[in-house]
């Protein structure tokens, strides 16, 4: 966002099963929504969309995929980022069932539903025509799938500041802070960056690019 890129967030579940404090159960949904909004603000994002699915039980159902298709056709992004639909056995905590379901729902939406005018025809009738997503970037997946590393050294403090806002999800904030910074430095080394740099790691998939058979 610092470079002027327009960014939108889609939050699929309400996070109602998250957190660690029993006393917060009644207000956890509102608490997590507020944390998300503030964390997004820190990152320069104001366009948030909540799908209000149940935490821990997300499925890539016809209805959920339809919600994602509708949102994509409204926003028409050049790049879609999503959790990876494949389980990461190197660190299984990356592969929460909701993360896997999110990745699968987004994948089904990106291809073929969002570009198929006959999928969810009610959307086209409502003025949301089909369009082709150029790129899908996955994160949080198996390390061997990662093929693109982005240097974020100048933005690490902003990232960690935003993560810290999700206080209900971090029983040990300082340990989380150190863990994130270490992981980002490891990503940079894996990506061939200079020692001391930090990077995000992605599995980039071209959907409709010069290298793909667009529309086939």
Predicted regions and their residues:
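Active-site rim/loop-helix segments in enzyme catalytic domains that contact anionic ligands
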Residues: 1-76, 203, 215
């Amino acid at each position: 966002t610092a470079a002027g890129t327009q960014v939108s967030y889609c939050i699929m579940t309400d996070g109602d099963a998250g957190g660690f404090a029993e006393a917060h159960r009644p207000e956890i949904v509102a608490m997590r929504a507020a944390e998300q909004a503030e964390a997004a603000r820190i990152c320069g994002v104001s366009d948030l969309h909540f799908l209000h699915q149940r935490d821990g039980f997300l499925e890539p159902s016809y209805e959920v995929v339809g919600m994602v298709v509708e949102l994509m056709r409204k926003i028409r992004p050049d790049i879609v980022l999503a959790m990876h639909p494949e389980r990461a056995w190197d660190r299984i905590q990356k592969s929460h069932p909701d993360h896997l379901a999110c990745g699968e729902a987004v994948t089904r939406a990106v291809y073929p539903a969002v570009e198929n005018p006959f999928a969810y025809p009610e959307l086209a009738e409502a003025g949301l025509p089909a369009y082709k997503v150029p790129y899908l970037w996955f994160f949080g997946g198996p390390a061997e799938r990662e093929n693109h590393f982005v240097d974020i050294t100048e933005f690490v403090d902003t990232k960690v500041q935003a993560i810290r806002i999700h206080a209900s999800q971090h029983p040990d904030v300082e340990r989380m802070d150190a863990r994130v910074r270490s992981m980002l430095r490891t990503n940079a080394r894996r990506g061939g960056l200079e020692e001391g740099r930090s990077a995000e790691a992605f599995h980039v998939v071209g959907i409709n690019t010069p290298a793909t058979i667009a529309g086939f």
